Amino acid sequence: MFTRIGAAAYKKDLHNTIELCEALGNPQNYFQTIHVAGTNGKGSTSHMLAAILQEAGYKTGLYTSPHIKAFGERIRINGQMIDETFVIDFVARTKELTSKVEPSFFELTVAMAFEYFATEAVDIAVIETGLGGRLDSTNIISPILSIITNIGYDHMNILGNTLPEIAGQKAGIIKKDTPAVIGEILPITKNIFVQEANEKDAILHFAQSRYQVEYLEPTGNLLFCHVKDLQTNTTEKLRLDLNGIYQAKNVCTVLCAVEQLRALGYKIPEAVQQNALEHVKELTGMRGRWDIVQSHPAIIHDVAHNVDGIKQVLYQLKTSYPNAQLHFVLGFVKDKDVEHVLDLFPKNAFFYFTNAHIPRALPHEELRNIAAQKGLTGEGFDDVNEAIEAAKKLAGEHDAIMICGSFFIIGEIQ
């Protein structure tokens, strides 16, 4: 399975997913969907949209990956994780089918999610891609709206080494005669989306051309955000419980997506939208995005794991804790661009190198050696929680401890 093993488990075609779903009666055709792709921000965007839709009264499915603690995090309806009995029954019922098709773990979970949403008769489901878009297992749906949050460097061994190549894979979720929202715009990739949309008679909506963040202030566990609608020249004052400042980009994408949903007939009052954005964690169970779990010293969990994601959390650390001694509990998986990620970290910080207990994890000894070549020094730990305890013992009351680098590192925190 890709989650634990990595690129070796990735399959570059939709054959297995199509065969699985056809055998199940194509459950993905029995509910409306929104498809979300992007290098960073697709999980946050998916959760925000799901929160808004369910708060507006729609029975809302949500499929995301990977999970942090429990498998059920991947498949939710109105924030509630999939019933364990359904999972057990699904695996038992499809045993003969899976023996024949031999799907990957991800392919099987996609089919399971689609059948669960169909069985439970959701009104709509927000479906996050696993990797890329064009050949991702989720890309057998016919969404009413496609969303691409941004394009950055990640999974280059699979998606391509250039931003246009990566964009070309993400653009594959744009569908014929279907609106598509593009979050961040890069001059080098914009034409990729325009060309794909033209070929499919899809209408593109660029969030950055419609919305602009005028004011941004993280305060405790909330992010205060003023967003200007450039079309109506009005400003909406929002409070987000997803309080990483990088969420400002995502919220513009979400607002643009909600406008398209309203145009499609979905009734989403402004007050409902505002309340949902303030309670995303409560409504959808989202975790791992700038979670401040302690104040003195500050302890923050974030699943940031690539160059763009790490840049964002380091910027917020610098602005939120300008005088603090920084401590980093770090662990990565083998297929990440660790060398370039480590170039971003301050050399005067304390480091605690560790690894999750999965085959795909980069051993902490190897991570420590790479870091030493970058001028970053610290100790190595076999266990994530041992690394955290070491950081807590050394950190002063006014220091800040950042735990990041992988979903799996966050998942092993006790």
Where are these regions (language model features)?
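Beta-strand->loop->alpha-helix junctions that form or flank phosphate-binding loops
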Residues: 183-184, 198-218, 240-244, 274-280, ...
